[in-house]
Curated annotation (Swiss-Prot):
GO BP annotation list: cell division; cell wall organization; peptidoglycan biosynthetic process; regulation of cell shape; UDP-N-acetylgalactosamine biosynthetic process
GO cellular component: cytoplasm
Lineage: Bacteria, Pseudomonadati, Pseudomonadota, Alphaproteobacteria, Hyphomicrobiales
Protein family membership: Belongs to the EPSP synthase family. MurA subfamily.
Pfam families to which the protein is assigned, alphabetical: EPSP_synthase
Protein's UniProt name: UDP-N-acetylglucosamine 1-carboxyvinyltransferase
Presence of the UniProt keyword Transferase in the record: yes
CDD domains, A to Z: UdpNAET
Keyword Iron-sulfur: no
Keyword annotations of the record: Cell cycle, Cell division, Cell shape, Cell wall biogenesis/degradation, Cytoplasm, Peptidoglycan synthesis, Pyruvate, Transferase
Highest taxon of the lineage: Bacteria
Source species: Rhodopseudomonas palustris (strain HaA2)
């Protein structure tokens, strides 16, 4: 099993190109099931989760071709995928594939919308909280789907097709919004999604669906209106830049010191995180190529943050911020409101010498003057990269184990950091 070895203490200087957003690429790939024409997606990141979803879609009969780089593409330019779901041969998504990634459960929506039936295994993925699919099931039932659970599978049928409805989520749910949005595009009549998630990735998917002929308004607001259409056609769409990757590298620079240009980043996608970084002592400069992050001389200031749905501080940057705050001059407080059990990285950060205490959903981080390298183990995707951030500033050597979590969500992480002066290498086997 691969590991990452890091010798801490180097400041970061240079340019890091930001990849396409995983959290947009996955639902965009799934949305290709809605049409029998080809969907072309540009700037798709090369990630383990993307490769897994290609296998899952292939199981349904989807043909996916990865195109080569075009003239002028950057070295890290995301891949272009040509996705054709002309012939869906199977409406079952098996346990052995779906159990590896929760987002793959979302195939239930386009399969129902287009084929009027689906049998999908209950999902897997990062072990963060329970993440029940109840809200997704509720949304589908509102659209006229008959559902049952049999031997770990959700068996769903809509013999007469989906019918437009008003769906009001009791709490904001990104997964539920994605599922309702995709399903409603081919439903008969009008669908209103109330208390919808406002994340940029939702808007990106809606933009792509509209290019395919959907009639969606209000994406990016709590109220989305979908006028169902009979058919969607092919389209070409570029995946938006990854705001979580952007925030992660910004926090790495704030941790080590130095100055890095985050090329292709879009500041409006993570303004809350940039505001927190400014409070922590980083200098943020917006320019034509993205975002420049620097911390020169000044120490790290403590912050108090509560995670919240967009446009609030993203839960997917909580672990990275906690790593940064281990070196702050004073006590920081981070409250996690999105997922339960999302403090699994605390005990691993403690191995560096971090001082962190937990009280319910709030973590108090008492900054220390130095961290020391240690062998650590990744527990989930975002926690794993928080260990990398800590290691970059720690004295001595750190070995990060179980890095398959990193490969799920960060494209060429060690290459990007190494190019900016970090001493970091992947050790195979």
């Amino acid at each position: 099993m691969d590991r990452i070895r890091i010798i801490g203490g180097n400041k970061l200087h240079g340019t890091i190109p930001i990849s396409g957003a995983k959290n947009a690429a996955l639902p965009l790939m799934i949305a290709a099931l809605l049409s029998d024409e080809t969907l072309i997606l540009d700037n798709v990141p090369r990630l383990a989760d993307v490769a897994l979803l290609q296998r899952i879609l292939g199981n349904h009969g989807v043909d996916i071709m990865a195109a080569g780089k075009r003239p002028g593409d950057h070295e890290y330019q995301g891949q272009t995928l040509h996705i054709s779901a002309k012939n869906i041969i199977d409406t079952t998504a098996p346990y052995e594939l779906v159990s590896k990634m929760r987002a793959s459960f979302w195939v239930i929506a386009p399969l129902l919308a287009r084929m009027h039936e689906a049998k999908v295994s209950l999902p897997g993925g990062c072990a963060i909280g329970t993440r029940p699919v109840d809200l997704l099931i509720m949304a589908l039932e509102k659209l006229g789907v008959e559902l049952s659970i049999d031997a770990g599978y959700v068996v769903a049928k809509a013999p007469g097709g989906l019918k437009g409805a008003t769906i009001e989520f009791p709490k904001v749910t990104v997964s539920g919004t994605h599922v309702a949005l995709m399903a409603a595009t081919l439903a008969k009549g009008t669908t209103i999604i109330s208390n919808a998630a406002c994340e940029p990735e939702i808007t990106d998917v809606a933009d792509c669906l509209n290019k395919m002929g959907a009639r969606i308004t209000g994406a990016g607001t709590p109220r989305i209106l979908i006028e169902g259409v009979d058919k969607l056609h092919g389209a070409r769409h570029t995946v938006l830049p990854d705001r979580i990757e952007t925030g992660t590298y910004a926090m790495a620079v704030a941790m080590t010191g130095g100055e890095v240009q985050l090329s292709g980043a879009r500041p409006e996608l993570l303004q809350s995180a940039l505001d927190v970084l400014t409070q922590a002592g980083a200098t943020i400069t917006i320019n034509n190529d993205g975002i420049k992050v620097a911390r020169n001389g000044a120490g790290i200031s403590p912050v108090t943050v509560t995670t919240a749905p967009f446009p609030g501080f993203p839960t997917d940057l909580q672990a990275q911020l906690m790593a940064l705050m281990t070196r702050a001059k004073g006590a920081s407080h981070i409250t996690e409101t999105i997922f339960e059990n999302r403090f699994m990285h605390v005990q691993e950060l403690a191995r560096f010498g971090a001082k962190i205490s937990l009280d319910g959903e709030t973590a108090t981080i008492d900054g220390v003057t130095k961290l020391r390298g240690a062998p650590v183990m990744a527990t989930d995707l975002r926690a794993s990269v928080s260990l990398v951030i800590a290691a970059l500033a720690a004295e001595g050597e750190t070995m990060v184990n179980r890095i398959y979590h990193l490969d799920r969500g960060f494209e060429r992480l060690e290459e990007k950091l190494s190019a900016c002066g970090a001493t970091i290498e992947r050790i195979s086997g």
